[in-house]
């Protein structure tokens, strides 16, 4: 999908003051060095075991590089942005003109029942869904790569749904996605909590950490919260 170009400063302004000499017009954003073009902003974040800049080579095309410090010997002209991995969703939302502001988004979290409930909600509302079953409307589902996609892809999907005239989106919000800030930049209309049982403790270490990750969905102001209090 084609987006109007945005100034680099408008995308990064909340996190840093950009040198006027570094201003650029940005036509695309990515976290993947294989998707770079001459008008692309490369958001080079730190991962679990590698930093995106580990894959930098001088011949990579990019309008600008924003990277998450610390990183030894970043490329000349690369812009340090503290906690970049936590801001990816917000940056993507600004690039795509805040699509969640035009949508009623229902976020569903919990150990069990997310996929079924999101599918039922998409059926009931005639809207789109994002989850394990797929991404899109029920008559045109795209295969899912993750329960909750990466933050840039989420915002791209939401912008597509907005531009197609869709008004409601039901999405699975996994504990991994919440812990990794993948749903940053999304204004949820409704938050739903299905249940909590032992799962993903290889990632969350204990039940308290797992619960706190799920609870992040409800940390933002929600017009409506639906919480299952009897899972018998």
Where are these regions (language model features)?
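Helix N-cap/beta->alpha junction signal
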Residues: 69, 229-231
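N-terminal leader/targeting and accessory segments in enzymes
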Residues: 1-90
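Phosphate-binding loop of NTP-binding sites
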Residues: 88-229
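A short acidic, amphipathic alpha-helical/loop segment
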Residues: 54-58, 181-182, 232
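Short, surface-exposed acidic/glycine-rich loop or hinge patches that mediate macromolecular interfaces
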Residues: 47-50, 82, 111, 148, ...
């Amino acid at each position: 999908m084609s987006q109007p170009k945005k100034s680099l400063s408008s995308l990064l302004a909340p996190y840093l003051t950009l040198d006027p000499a570094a201003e650029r017009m940005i036509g695309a954003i990515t976290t993947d060095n294989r998707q770079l073009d001459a008008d692309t902003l490369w958001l080079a974040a730190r991962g679990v075991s590698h930093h995106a800049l580990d894959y930098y080579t001088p011949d990579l095309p990019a309008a600008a590089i924003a990277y998450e410090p610390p990183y030894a010997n970043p490329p000349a002209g690369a812009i340090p942005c503290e906690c970049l991995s936590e801001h990816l969703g917000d940056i993507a939302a600004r690039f795509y003109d805040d699509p969640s502001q035009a949508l009623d988004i229902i976020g569903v979290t919990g150990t069990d029942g997310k996929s079924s409930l999101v599918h039922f909600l998409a059926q009931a509302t005639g809207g789109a869904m994002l989850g394990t079953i797929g991404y899109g409307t029920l008559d045109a589902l795209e295969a899912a790569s993750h329960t909750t996609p990466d933050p840039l892809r989420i915002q791209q999907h939401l912008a597509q749904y907005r531009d197609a005239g869709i008004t409601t989106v039901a999405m699975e919000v996994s504990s991994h996605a919440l812990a990794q800030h993948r749903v940053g930049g999304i204004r949820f209309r409704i938050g739903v909590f299905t249940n909590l049982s032992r799962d993903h403790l290889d990632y969350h270490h204990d039940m308290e950490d797992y619960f706190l990750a799920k609870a992040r969905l409800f940390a933002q102001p929600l017009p409506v919260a639906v919480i299952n209090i009897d899972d018998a």
